[in-house]
Amino acid sequence: MGAVGVGLVDCHCHLSAPDFDHDLDDVLKKAKEANVMALVVVAEHSGEFEKIMQLSQRYNGFVLPCLGVHPVQGVSPEDQRSVTLKDLDVALPIIENYKDQLLAIGEVGLDFSPRFAGTDEQKEEQRQVLIRQVQLAKRLNLPLNVHSRSAGRPTISLLNEQGADKVLLHAFDGRPSVAMEGVKAGYFFSIPPSIIRSGQQKLVKQLPLTSICLETDSPALGPEKQVRNEPRNISISAEYIAQVKGVSVEEVIEVTTQNALKLFPKLQRLLPK
């Protein structure tokens, strides 16, 4: 498409990851060349909040910040553990400090993978951390950028019970029938480039295009396993969705960008007038 027409929005990526420390300028240049108009950058733990805010200032109007506490904490794989309310207590004052600059609260959610949430106590604490962040998002009138690995139904139920309305479920791994409960509630689902090699292809078939957004989850969930993903690969998601839905890539880009604008109202201000 080049620079003509509507740009793409990467609704969920991790640009503060160390994987991008050495060449972020180049990565963002390639994203712009691939017609990406906005990058929604999410946090996982309070230790990266300042870095994300600095990136959003450095690439103002292109990198849009979300702050939140992920259900899995710990920077390196061997340190990873289920979130606690203490993790949230450290994060909340920083989120409050930046509340006016945020696009959304995220990445938040539930992760019931057995290695992180093997006990009912851990699951319950994850729920409490999520409930408090849903309440925070409602108070600040911000959308939620949500993780739900191995916890599709519990996550959608909790969001519903708490009255969350603007919700993005990223890289949803639950059953399509569970996803449809989210569609009924008005939630959006973002599809990463790994869709071309994942078991979630039925999900794309069943979700209406009006409920789909695009994401990369960079540096994870790329088209090839073990290869660093980056925002320019978002076109792979768009092409795959177009193929499954039997529509043009242009239509997928147009509809998913409109969906992103509905979901993240602050994006409107960034559009060229």
Curated annotation (Swiss-Prot):
- Gene3D superfamilies from the xrefs? Metal-dependent hydrolases
Activity regulation (record text): The 3'-exonuclease activity is sensitive to the metal ion present in the active site, whereas the AP endodeoxyribonuclease activity is observed in a variety of divalent metal cofactors. 3'-exoxonuclease activity is suppressed in the presence of Ca(2+), Zn(2+) and Ni(2+).
Q: So which cofactors does this thing need? A: Mn(2+); Ca(2+); Mg(2+); Zn(2+)
Where is Zn(2+) 2 annotated to bind?
A: 107, 147, 170
Cofactor binding note = Binds 2 Zn(2+) per subunit. Exhibits AP endonuclease and 3'-exonuclease activities in the presence of Mg(2+) and Mn(2+). In contrast, in the presence of Ca(2+), shows AP endonuclease activity exclusively.
- List, alphabetically, the SUPFAM superfamilies matched: Metallo-dependent hydrolases (SSF51556)
Q: Where does Zn(2+) 1 bind?
A: 12, 14, 107, 217
GO cellular component terms, alphabetically, are: nucleus
Any GO MF annotation of the entry: nuclease activity
Subcellular location field: Nucleus
| Hydrolase in keyword set | yes
Q: EC number(s) of the enzyme?
A: 3.1.21.-
| The entry's keywords | Hydrolase, Metal-binding, Nuclease, Nucleus, Zinc
Q: Enumerate the PANTHER family for this protein.
A: DEOXYRIBONUCLEASE TATDN3-RELATED (PTHR46317:SF7), HYDROLASE OF PHP SUPERFAMILY-RELATED PROTEIN (PTHR46317)
Q: What does this protein do?
A: Exhibits 3'-exonuclease activities and apurinic/apyrimidinic (AP) endonuclease (in vitro). Show preferential AP endonuclease activity on double-stranded DNA substrates and 3'- exonuclease activity on single-stranded DNA.
Family indicated by similarity: Belongs to the metallo-dependent hydrolases superfamily. TatD-type hydrolase family.
Q: What is this protein called?
A: Putative deoxyribonuclease TATDN3
**Species whose genome carries this gene:** Bos taurus (Bovine)
